[in-house]
Amino acid sequence: MNLHEYQAKQLFADYGLPVPSGIPCSSADEAVAATKKLGGDKWVVKCQVHAGGRGKAGGVKVAGSEQEVRAFADQWLGKRLVTYQTDANGQPVNTILVETCGNIAKELYLGAVIDRSSRRVVFMASTEGGMDIETVAHNTPELIHKAALDPLTGPQPYQARELGFKLGLNAEQLKQFTKIFLGLGKMFVACDLSLLEINPLVITGEGNLLCLDGKINIDSNALYRQPKLKAWNDETQEDPREVEAARWDLNYVALDGNIGCMVNGAGLAMGTMDIIKHHGGFPANFLDVGGGATKERVTEAFKLILSDSKVKAVLVNIFGGIVRCDLIADGVIGAVAEVGVKVPVVVRLEGNNADLGSKKLAESGLNIIAATSLTDAAEQVVKAAEAVA
């Protein structure tokens, strides 16, 4: 689960990190009122969306008057912001953040991720703040400095000092950086984060450190024990189909193709998409119904696939282990009958109760194409999609 910038900064503040004074606003009047409350004669206004690249897309502006703030709010609120990290439709802008504007002497980078190979939280710091960290890692990896946290002891002051020295901080800034580092380390574990970034972490004209931006990803599997953070989830930033899939514990990711896929198991789902591509087709989605699929979940999965108007054919690929193929067949039959499917459906069933499942499909009277193998299924569904198109 992603947080907006203003939410990330609120969490930073809860852990004692220095952040600019700012007010999230959902209307132009609120934005103008925020400038009065914040004071000063210059403000930074930012569109709040779950995507990077806002500045280059016009979603961040330094405003020197209340009129400019109002114009920015009128321009973006209720609209969609398209960046290099969004699709062509962009993300809806429901909130803008109005912040005080200060002097920046230098931009740094500070972030943390879970390193799967070492099974530790790893902090990364760089003097190349304000840039895409992936680009820095590719072009100049020597400029990224790392510190791995021991899960038994957590973040240590000496690790902060080592990173701070490499960033060229002075004695006072080292104290501030240590406080930020220790706070982030505690927050990362306590809030079940999977990623955090402060880009840039700036040195102000007065020589102090300030978290000028914030990006936080939370482990969705841990939301059951993070009720406060779960309440911050903005579903408008997500694909409505993916939101609906989550309600049924389905793993769904929308893609740009025209062949819908329903598979049990993430590995088999990826393999299914690969073989569709291999035979000249284009998957419309990734959808894993999981090992504990029920008739109801399969029905909802089928309805979810067919809600995409681009879908011209559907491939159901089930290898029955825990999942019984006859239950999958019941779900397919129920969905086809309920939704009124008008596109070809290719079904490949193998494993637990596959014969019974195939028998149910054959006796259903529905226009379902039975496949004898995965290769046959891919060839048939690509051919069917091309015929409809």
Curated annotation (Swiss-Prot):
**Signal peptide coordinates:** none
Q: Note the Gene3D superfamilies from the entry.
A: ATP-grasp fold, A domain, ATP-grasp fold, B domain, Succinyl-CoA synthetase domains
Recorded family membership: Belongs to the succinate/malate CoA ligase beta subunit family.
Q: Hey, which pathway is this one from?
A: Carbohydrate metabolism; tricarboxylic acid cycle; succinate from succinyl-CoA (ligase route): step 1/1
> What does the record say about how the cofactor binds?
Binds 1 Mg(2+) ion per subunit.
InterPro entries according to UniProt: ATP-grasp, ATP-grasp_succ-CoA_synth-type, ATP_grasp_subdomain_1, Succ-CoA_synthase_bsu_CS, SUCC_ACL_C, Succ_CoA_ligase-like_bsu, Succinyl-CoA_synth-like
Q: Which residues bind Mg(2+)?
A: 199, 213
Which Pfam families would you find in this protein's record? ATP-grasp_2 (PF08442), Ligase_CoA (PF00549)
Identify the keywords attached in UniProt to this record, alphabetized. ATP-binding, Ligase, Magnesium, Metal-binding, Nucleotide-binding, Tricarboxylic acid cycle
Q: Which cofactor does it need?
A: Mg(2+)
Per UniProt, substrate binds at 264, 321-323
Q: Which reaction does it catalyse?
A: succinate + ATP + CoA = succinyl-CoA + ADP + phosphate; GTP + succinate + CoA = succinyl-CoA + GDP + phosphate
Organism classification: Bacteria, Pseudomonadati, Pseudomonadota, Gammaproteobacteria, Aeromonadales
Please give a single GO biological process term from the UniProt record. tricarboxylic acid cycle
Q: What does this protein do?
A: Succinyl-CoA synthetase functions in the citric acid cycle (TCA), coupling the hydrolysis of succinyl-CoA to the synthesis of either ATP or GTP and thus represents the only step of substrate-level phosphorylation in the TCA. The beta subunit provides nucleotide specificity of the enzyme and binds the substrate succinate, while the binding sites for coenzyme A and phosphate are found in the alpha subunit.
Q: Which molecular function GO terms apply here?
A: ATP binding; magnesium ion binding; succinate-CoA ligase (ADP-forming) activity; succinate-CoA ligase (GDP-forming) activity
- Name this protein carries in UniProt: Succinate--CoA ligase [ADP-forming] subunit beta
Where is ATP annotated to bind? 46, 53-55, 99, 102, 107
Q: What is its EC number?
A: 6.2.1.5
Give the ATP-grasp domain ranges.
9-244
Quaternary structure, per UniProt, is:
Heterotetramer of two alpha and two beta subunits.
Q: Name one GO cellular component term.
A: succinate-CoA ligase complex
| Database matches in PROSITE patterns | ATP_GRASP, SUCCINYL_COA_LIG_3
